[in-house]
């Protein structure tokens, strides 16, 4: 056991309630600027991507390969407590709290100056869809993803699970559609809007501009 670890065996412990709130309430995540990541692989990816670690929880009696020294707080959870705070039934024996990255549009300015291709998601509603799009964006070499007026929290547990690590690999920014368009225009981006129409141009036939913004509309439209 880590020499500075704290054993928590009661599900009524305030720290346990804090974790549960972060998992279940987007308002808690936003107000505290924190999110929960489960599983050794995902936690290690977050650390490697320079996400700021806050605390880690490990099941009592288990061993993990994560470098726990980077976490200011280390908790050892009883089986009962771990079952309470684990969002997924298949979670490996580690759960961690990280500070969420700055997703404000102001934080995107330096990146937009050097980016060549970005993706804009308009009003996305489903965590699974966002996770899948993030994976595709990483595979396609997209430089950043912008969420315009999203209906979901990008740092919710279902997005993190469905992104399978992609959330740590690509910069993400959130804002209203009009402001996002203003920022992109200031950096000379050309918009390309996706459309399921027989007269739409194939992506393989388009001569892409030097700075490209691909826009995906809402799922229901």
Cite the ranges covered by each PLM segment.
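Glycine/small-residue-rich loop that forms an oxyanion/phosphate-binding "nest" at active or ligand-binding sites
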Residues: 71-99
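Boundary-proximal intrinsically disordered activation/regulatory segments immediately upstream
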Residues: 4-62, 151-152
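Short, hydrophobic beta-strand segments that form beta-sheet elements in well-ordered domains
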Residues: 36, 54-60, 190-195, 214-217
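Active-site cofactor/substrate anionic-group-binding motifs, chiefly glycine-
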Residues: 52-80
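Short acidic-hydrophobic, aromatic-tinged amphipathic segments that line or gate anion-handling sites
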Residues: 7-10, 75-78, 170-180
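RNA substrate-binding interface of SAM-dependent RNA methyltransferases
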Residues: 48, 102-103, 107-203
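Alpha-helix capping/helix-boundary segments
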Residues: 41-43, 62-63, 81-82, 151-152, ...
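Active-site/ligand-binding-proximal alpha/beta "capping" segment
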Residues: 193-221
């Amino acid at each position: 056991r880590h020499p500075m670890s704290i054993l928590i065996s009661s599900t009524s412990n305030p720290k346990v309630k804090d974790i549960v709130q972060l998992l279940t309430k987007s308002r808690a995540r936003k107000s505290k600027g924190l999110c929960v990541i489960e599983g050794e692989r995902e936690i290690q990816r977050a650390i490697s991507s320079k996400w700021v670690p806050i605390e880690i929880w490990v099941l009592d009696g288990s061993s993990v390969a994560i470098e726990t020294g980077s976490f200011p707080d280390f908790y050892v959870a009883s089986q009962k407590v771990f079952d309470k705070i684990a969002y997924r039934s298949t979670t490996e024996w580690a759960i961690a709290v990280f500070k969420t990255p700055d997703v404000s549009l102001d934080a995107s300015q330096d990146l937009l100056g050097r980016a060549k291709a970005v993706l804009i998601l308009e009003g996305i509603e489903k965590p699974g869809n966002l996770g899948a799009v993030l994976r595709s964006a990483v595979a396609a070499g997209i430089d950043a993803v912008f969420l315009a007026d999203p209906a979901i929290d990008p740092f919710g547990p279902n997005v993190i699970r469905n992104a399978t690590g992609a959330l740590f690999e690509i910069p993400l920014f959130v804002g209203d559609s009009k402001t996002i368009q203003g920022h992109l225009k200031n950096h000379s981006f050309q918009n390309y809007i996706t459309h399921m129409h027989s007269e739409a141009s194939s992506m393989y036939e388009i001569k892409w501009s030097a700075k490209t913004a691909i826009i995906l509309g809402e799922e229901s439209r």
